[in-house]
Amino acid sequence: MRRFYSLLLMVLCCTGLFAKTKKAVYIIIDGVPADQIERLHTPAIFDIASRGAYGRAYTGGEIGGYSQTATISAIGYTNLLTSTWFNKHNVGGNSDLKPNYNYWTIFRIAKEQPKEYKTAIYSSWTDNRTVLIGEGKKETNNLKIDYVKDGYDLDTVRFPKKEKDLHIFDIDEQISKDAAEGIRK
C-alpha cells in the first residue's frame, strides 16, 4: 500500500492576518502530497503559516497495525476532524457513511465551549458537513455550522462535468474564493 500524506495546515490566533478578529483556520487539502506544497512553496499557504503554524498529517495509519486506514477522502477527513482512526469513528469509505458521533469533531468541540465560537465550512461535498460532521443531528447535540459554502459537486449548472474531471478545478477555485472572503470578514 502506497503511503499517502495529506496536508494539514493549522493556523492559530492569526491576529491581523485577514481580519480584526482572532481566528483558527484548519485547512485540509485532499490528494496533494505535502512535499509538493513544500517544494513549490505556495505563497498563500506559507504566508498564513508564517503567522501561525503548519504541519503534516498522516491519515493512513500504521501499515499492518490496528490504525491502518485506506487513503480515501471521507476516512481521512474523519481521521483529521475527530483525531481518531477508522476503528473508532466508523467511516470506512466514501459511501454508506455511518459515523460514530461519540468521537467529537473539532466543530462540535468548538461549539460545546462555554465561550461562543463561530464555525465555517468551505467544501465541495455536502456530506462533509451533513454526515461526517453531523450538522443538525441529535447525536451531535444538533450541531450548527455558522457559515456554510458547500455542495458544489451537485451543481452541474455552474460546474458542468468536464473531460478528465477538470470541473473539480473550477469547484476548488470557487471554494478557495469563498474561504478567502469568509476569513477576511
Task: Please name every model-derived segment.
Residues 28, 52-63, 166-176:
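Short charge-dense sequence patches
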Residues 23-28, 36:
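Boundary/entry segment of secreted carbohydrate-active catalytic domains
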Residues 11, 39-40, 132:
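Hydrophobic alpha-helical membrane-insertion segments
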Residues 27-32, 59-61, 84, 122-127:
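Active-site-proximal beta-strand/loop segments in catalytic clefts of secreted hydrolases
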Residues 20, 34-115:
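Active-site nucleophile/metal-coordination loop of metallo-enzymes that catalyze phosphate/sulfate
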Residues 1-22:
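Bacterial Sec-dependent N-terminal signal peptides
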Residues 82-185:
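His/Asp/Glu-rich, glycine-adjacent segments
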